[in-house]
Curated annotation (Swiss-Prot):
This is UPF0102 protein Acid345_3985. It comes from Koribacter versatilis (strain Ellin345). The lineage of its organism: Bacteria, Pseudomonadati, Acidobacteriota, Terriglobia, Terriglobales. Belongs to the UPF0102 family. GO terms for molecular function: nucleic acid binding. InterPro entries: Restrct_endonuc-II-like, tRNA_endonuc-like_dom_sf, UPF0102_YraN-like. Pfam families: UPF0102. Coiled coil: none annotated.
Length: 143
């Protein structure tokens, strides 16, 4: 399975990046691909990626089920650990943006669907990427 994941990521790296794409966008895209496979390996059923609405600038990187909980997952990728942690980039403003988009997504779900927001951090500063999940990083209600 590990070999398949590595091959899939290499294939996606070859297909997805555009030559003129800024380096930080390439890094983010690679992190999201790694997070996608990592989450699947850890039991998540992915139902959407890069979900946007016409009314909000933010997007939900990954949406998936973990058990009976619908998870809205923000992926943060870093190539260095010199500054703040990756999860620190999900500040109050970003959280509120993600909540707005999640509420829009929830309009198509059953009422009272259990939800949570997870943050996946991806560090690419070592030969093997380091990926972690922070489950229930914040709530839909804004608490």
């Amino acid at each position: 399975m590990r070999v398949f994941t590595q091959l899939a990521v290499r294939l996606l790296d070859a297909i997805l990046p555009e030559p003129d794409e800024p380096e930080h966008l390439k890094t983010g895209r690679r992190g999201e691909e790694l997070a996608y496979f990592f989450l699947r390996k850890h039991g998540y059923t992915i139902v959407a990626r890069n979900f946007r609405t016409p009314w909000h600038k933010s997007e939900l990187d990954i949406i998936g089920w973990n058990g009976g909980i619908l998870c809205f997952i923000e992926v943060k990728t870093r190539t260095t650990r010199d500054i703040a942690t990756a999860e620190a980039a999900v500040d109050d403003t970003k959280r509120n943006d993600l909540r707005r988009v999640a509420r829009h997504y929830l309009r198509q779900c059953a009422e009272n669907t259990p939800t949570r927001f997870d943050i996946v951090t991806v560090y690419l500063d070592r030969p093997k990427p380091e990926i972690t999940i922070l489950k229930s990083a914040f709530l839909l209600s804004g608490e």
